């Protein structure tokens, strides 16, 4: 078992979102290590202003060359893009490091046409901004049938949960990338791995979303 599977304690972003979830729900947060992240109602309410109409098939928004570990974990992304992305797809690399080396791949590549600053800076100085809701980022996922969810600086993907709450189907390199501990990995979400046949399943989307609301929110436990 890799070291990340014993890393039960939540990182900064998940910790802050979980604290907000308990506070907004008026529920006392349990004492001790929390290993399943929660999203607060105020965060989930942002989706009310976003369309879930599927205008894209595949999408990926993020960084690749920002850090050696991330570059290694995401080395499969560009080959996948070149093989599977279509005129309906959406790609955007959003770090200065990517802009320096990337060459536009196709009409679906919006890397050089989008000027907004990337979500995470080179030195991972996250701060509270990392807990903010990026409407453009989530909007693309909400309008996509599938979202690429590569590992980041650790062998798991926060994007996996973001994809599910956006009602898109995750595509992972490996099974264990769906969570940084066994409890998360065994929740039971449905997703595709590299090499699968990527068939859009509305029943998967509905199942995953309902499971997410039950497992990762306190929307049904408010005072």
Identify what each model region corresponds to.
Residues 1-161, 165-189, 211-222:
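Nucleotide-sugar donor-binding catalytic core of glycosyltransferases
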Residues 187-212:
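C-terminal "capping" alpha-helix adjacent to the active site of nucleotide-linked donor transferases
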